[in-house]
Amino acid sequence: MLFQEFHSAMSAPAIFTSNQVYAWRPGFDKNNFTRWTKKGLLIKLRNGYYTFPEFLHEPNFAFFVANKIYKPSYISLHSALAFYGLIPETIVQLTSVSTRKTNTFENPFGTFSYKTIKPQVFFGYDPLPFSGEKKLLMAKPEKALLDLLYLYPFYKTKNDFLNLRLDESFIEESFNIELLQSLADGFKSATLANRVKNLLKVIV
């Protein structure tokens, strides 16, 4: 099979699975995945997931990768907070939450870390426009902060919250305190509610 034919068929979804390829062409030679990856024509994202190297230079494509290679998941925690400008740090790993087990993947787009949350708190994210009809599933800033407090219990004191260096202008102009409290109620966790109470003493 000519690679050009394959590329034409698979470039629209941008990220595709081996099963999608077999559905498109039942007689597809699986050795093509290895050959084309070695030649630099394909990028392997994780077992069974691939994309093309031209997407390495597309802004925010790593976020799209994060959504696609481990489902269900949405971008949250430090990566979402940095995306909104709520924290200043340069993020080494792209962090997401998922109802599946905690996992980490590495590929040419970066390191992708997934933390487990319960299905009942898998909410508070938006489908953000990305490219064409593609969307990125990203936590609302308020939910990203709640996920952080929920999954990292060492954030609990005034100094802990000050060390996060939350952007004051974003808090004043864009952060929704009422939404934060409403989303926190959905966790049904007295421990989290107490952390939120301490957080509000710092940011309000």
Role assignments for model-derived ranges:
Residues Q20, P53-V204:
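Nucleic-acid-binding surface
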